[in-house]
Amino acid sequence: MPAAQEGPAPTGADRPYHVRALRDAEAEVWVATSDDVPGLVAEAATIEELLDDLRSIIPDLLQLNAVPHTDRIEVNFIAERIEAIEPAA
């Protein structure tokens, strides 16, 4: 019989890492941060570029910070953008 795991399963094994991206309208970039991935701060001009960057940054940061994870890293990517809408006159 296999030994029982102690403690909760690492993030990524039973739940995704949460990453939030916010649009910085003044700087014209998307900025990603995460409480689940220590040290994660990334920016890019488009969401697509940001996602491409995160695919390499997240595994590197998890390894550098000795964060336990499975071979498959799942990410819940949440993007937010504030848009000002002027009513028609």
Question: How should these model regions be labeled?
Answer:
Residues 38-49:
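A short, exposed loop/beta-hairpin motif centered on an aromatic-Gly-Thr core
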